[in-house]
Amino acid sequence: MVKSIDIRQLSEAISVEKDNGTKVNYFLYPEFEIHQNVLPANTIQDWHKHQAIEEIIVPTKGNVTIQVLEDNAVRTYTANCGEVLRVKQSIHRIIGDDKEETEFIVFRFVPTGNDQSDKIKNDKVDCEKLVAEILKEK
């Protein structure tokens, strides 16, 4: 078994088809969760919120429209393919395109409140020379 890479097959996902036809494949990890969504055309999710998590939504087919209740008013935002939408702890719902299904990936995590941006930006270590040395020895 490979220790450095963890590839999850679709057969390992928790797959759910909701009453409104939305298909979701959940991949749960100890520190985060990723799920793939297929939202049928003309589908509107129920209003909901999360108690502790935040979500990052990445559209992969079509546009993702989200409505958020802010200051006692409904505000509408749209993220196109290639854009990233961060949903903080808010009352929200996702609205599908009126003509075609929408696909998107959701990354869920529990924010710690700690700024990790420097660690994230500077975490990469160049290993070209190390790998060349290791492979040269064989």
Question: What kind of region is each of these model predictions?
Answer:
Residues 44-46, 65, 83-94:
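Histidine-centered metal-chelating micro-motifs
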Residues 32-34, 44, 54, 63, ...:
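Intrinsic-disorder/low-complexity, polar/charged segments enriched in Ser/Thr/Lys/Arg/Asp/Glu/Gln
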Residues 89-117:
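Ligand-binding loop in jelly-roll beta-barrel domains
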Residues 39, 51-65:
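Short, conserved beta-strand element in jelly-roll/cupin
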Residues 49-51, 71, 97-100:
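Short glycine/proline-enriched turns and hinge-like loops at secondary-structure junctions
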